[in-house]
């Protein structure tokens, strides 16, 4: 299932993030993103299972030339944010992720940001 929302990596949480008002910008961005993602899943009636396939498509910077964008579209994204932090961001969908026992995750460059999440039931 494709979700048209730009992926966000989960920031490192500190104790201070629980009570600090307003929260740090990266924490505010993540909380907003997680609320939107949760709502998109509810609207689509999508419920993650215990085996997941994830694809994160990150938007290319506007500063890149058209030639470089055309070259990099669909290529693996090998810079920050790290893939493990992208996967951690899906805690918004799965409150108890200890039940997930199989996970495939990839990240790519694309013209616009979106996420593909599929249940892999064999």
Q: What annotation goes with each model-predicted range?
A:
Residues 1-122:
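Acidic, proline/glycine-enriched N-terminal capping motif
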């Amino acid at each position: 299932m494709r979700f048209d929302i730009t992926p966000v990596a989960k920031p490192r949480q500190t104790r201070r993030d629980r009570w600090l008002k307003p929260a740090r910008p990266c924490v505010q961005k993540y909380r907003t993103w997680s609320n939107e993602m949760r709502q998109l899943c509810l609207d689509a009636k999508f419920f993650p299972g215990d085996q997941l396939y994830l694809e994160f498509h990150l938007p290319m910077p506007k500063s890149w030339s058209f030639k470089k964008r055309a070259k990099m579209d669909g290529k693996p994204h090998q810079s920050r944010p790290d893939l493990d932090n992208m996967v951690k961001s899906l805690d918004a969908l799965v409150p108890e992720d200890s039940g997930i026992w199989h996970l495939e995750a990839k990240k790519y460059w694309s013209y616009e940001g979106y996420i593909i999440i599929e249940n892999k039931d064999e």
